[in-house]
Amino acid sequence: MTRRENDHYPTPPAAVDELLKELNPAWGYVCDPAAGDGALLDAALAEYTPERGYLAIEVDRAHKPPHYVLYADYLTLPPSVDPPALFICNPPYALAQEFVTKMLAERGPDTIVAALLRLGFLGSRKRHEWWKENHPHAIRILSKRPSFTGDGKTDNSEYMWAIWFGRPSADNPRPRPLWWYAGGA
């Protein structure tokens, strides 16, 4: 499979539905800093109330997410003074570490960060120290490979959601650290 410009691979609903049912973000808006066509925010809007607010940040004007969209390079934006309740992102693979690092740096005390990553992203000499400093609170493995091409075909990679939670609370206790979702096509 040839790489797409800006690593744009839309996230299928099956890859995110179980995650959104599990998460219980504090009240506030949901932000996807690599929104593409808005698939993750569409799924969040279907699971949560529209009054929350949904912000799509997208570098490529060819993609038109059906939400409030800020056309900008997330990695060069200054931090928001009002962090979201939930950062949810399928970042470009080549920039995944940079996206996650920035989301973690910009989260508020109650913000949840969820990034869809290749499972192989966990194993890397390059990221060894980074993972020790930024280990997620939970990993959700997608048992079925999702199709990011819209034709049902999958690549040969396994995928996971890496999740960092805000402060634990009665409404949002820390869940199991490792679990499996069906998640595929």
For each of these PLM feature ranges, what is it?
Residues 1-185:
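Class I S-adenosyl-L-methionine-dependent methyltransferase catalytic core
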